[in-house]
Amino acid sequence: MKYDLELDNVLSLFDGMSCGQLALDTLGIKVNNYFASEIDPYAIKIAKKNYPNTKHIGSVVDVKGADLPKIDLLIGGSPCQSFSNAGERTGMDGKSKLFWEFVRVLKETNPTYFLLENVRMKKEWENIITEQLGVKPILINSRLVSAQNRPRLYWTNIPNIEQPLDRGLLLKDILQETWDDKFNLSEKACDYMSRLRNGKPRWEYHTNPLNGKSACLTANMYKGVPYGVIKEQLRRLTPVECERLQTVPDNYTAGVSDTQRFKMLGNGWTIDVIAHILMNMKYYEPVITEKQLELI
């Protein structure tokens, strides 16, 4: 469904491959100026390929509110490695300290709407973010709109966000009928997967069932131990299948190596979840938080 809404200025921090722009485009929301802060050259290349009019403004540490026009929507997913179970688990002291850059830019721009995405984390870290943003997070699992298990927290002043309807998608629903041989597991990989871990073969830990949901895509899923393996087909997921798990159009990330495609998809957003949240801008005025009142 398309939504008749126009935004003059959108600012995306940690823009990656521009998932925010893709979600807005999915909703048919016109954006006159989309400012993107990102430093990964491969993600920037994909963003430029799909949205050549994007205004790239470099690293978040160099973004200054005084240099920007009035921002209608500020979005971002600050690096989550230090919060994530799959990452460093060092909280605010690791890479995730870039969250404070989001807070700084939020204060400097005082946007009409804002949205921050991050992984599930320790309650103490979640509470710090909630205190700084002035809104409580909403937990939405991408499994409702895709074939991927991906629970994420969303802090936003866009009101009345409900859970998306469950589409009932399974991994088998998004798989390609054919794939390149390079995605098949080697004999060495199959042997490794047959070894025991805690009394069970690794197949039990690293495989995705055809009649179930895929495990959460990660930025390092292309490294080392076979991850995202389809046991019934003895192969890994393809980049297009990972795009489908994130509800990204087929071959949106084409143009860089498979390694970089997997990385940016693992770092990215599930588009239909973001669109589900952003569509409420059409119907509801923003919640004015106490933090925003302090800036008036």
Mark where each language-model region is.
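Class I S-adenosyl-L-methionine
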Residues: K2, V63-L73, S78-R235, E241
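Extreme N-terminal starter segment of soluble prokaryotic enzymes
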Residues: L5-V10
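Class I SAM-dependent methyltransferase "Motif I" SAM/SAH-binding loop
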Residues: L13-S18
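Short beta-strand element of Class I
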Residues: N33-F35
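Conserved SAM/SAH-binding beta-strand->alpha-helix loop
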Residues: D40
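Conserved SAM-binding loop
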Residues: A47
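Conserved SAM-binding strand-loop segment of SAM-dependent methyltransferases
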Residues: N53-S59
